[in-house]
């Protein structure tokens, strides 16, 4: 019998409706795969086996009655940033030690409504702050990919490293993730998976632990473009509990997969050609351009002049919002509490013990740029830059451009505890150079696998769309996927 964990969501969904196997069998197959792989890859921080089997049994009952939802019986991994009622939810931080929320996030509630099954909670950078999944309280996630002829452990990207690695290693059919500055698209590119950051406001943020509220957005990571389209249809919704949720109909994204892109205008921004960029990234970009040309799209050279200021502005805006959001973690009502002689000392002791180094760094930066005397010089200026970045995109799309094609990352995955990057915070932050402008402008962006590096590691291209036009970038991404193919890695962890 076929290994059920190799099936895409679309394939598994079809087979389940035809009763070729049961949801309980599919779920068991994933739980066995997790049991075998997790000690090595560290993708899950909580495995909800009992709950998963209960949900699968209920799915089988609905399927037998012909009443299944669009994700009926599909086992998913959930990033540890999403509140799951009565289940471990810690944002992979010690400060939320033991926290089990009494409520469910809107995104996960939508998935359960449509019949999906929860396998467990996925590892991530602490409070989603990181680009390598090395800041987690539970230790780093190991990328399932390896360089040719090497046993070096590589990062899966971040902050949704657990989500991307679990999908790439076939430890879930798909996964939820979040993206504040590239945290879906960068790990997807590093692991040969597909990840989409929807338009800001497309998915509800209610029940998603906040990092930077004006930038955070939930989205899926899947094995291919179609799977991501299926997942986003379920995850997206209007939600009165989220004041930034936008009340627009959610298209059936899957219907756009396979449609022609003939006549579409694809912009290629000159500012994304970075000085000293690896030649294989430039070649990959050209390969993507050629694919789209052959499919009948028009390639237009464009300029996004303020893009170069997006990253420094982001690292002012995001920490500022984080320092405000994370002030609520004080040990009083939930999570870790470290005693002190009075309330102030208790707050200090709790935060000192509970937050990791990267989170502390960003809180310090954020508090500094919001402080008296520096607010106008830093935070206000960064918000003005943000407006200019968004205006560049608006003008580009107003001129008739349908989507923009760029690389997803400046490099393939790097080593765990890479000394050069570990000791250079700016080098780590530069991993998000191609993805951050999309968050600053609130636009949708998708990362699609587009080839392998000279060392055999996945590389990705990014498509940026108009606001609430996710269906267009799904359509174009599928053309690239069809031309270049999908990529998977050997399961070396099963032979250890």
UniProtKB/Swiss-Prot annotation:
Pfam families given in the database record: Amidase
Active site per database record: 79, 159, 183
GO molecular function: ATP binding; glutaminyl-tRNA synthase (glutamine-hydrolyzing) activity
Keywords (A to Z) from UniProt: ATP-binding, Ligase, Nucleotide-binding, Protein biosynthesis
One BP term from GO: translation
Recorded catalytic activity of this chain's protein: L-glutamyl-tRNA(Gln) + L-glutamine + ATP + H2O = L-glutaminyl-tRNA(Gln) + L-glutamate + ADP + phosphate + H(+)
EC number(s) on file: 6.3.5.7
Source domain of life: Bacteria
Keyword Nucleotide-binding: yes
Annotated GO CC locations: glutamyl-tRNA(Gln) amidotransferase complex
Entry similarity comment: Belongs to the amidase family. GatA subfamily.
Subunit structure: Heterotrimer of A, B and C subunits.
Functional summary from the UniProt entry: Allows the formation of correctly charged Gln-tRNA(Gln) through the transamidation of misacylated Glu-tRNA(Gln) in organisms which lack glutaminyl-tRNA synthetase. The reaction takes place in the presence of glutamine and ATP through an activated gamma-phospho-Glu-tRNA(Gln).
Descriptive protein name: Glutamyl-tRNA(Gln) amidotransferase subunit A
Source organism of this protein record: Bartonella quintana (strain Toulouse) (Rochalimaea quintana)
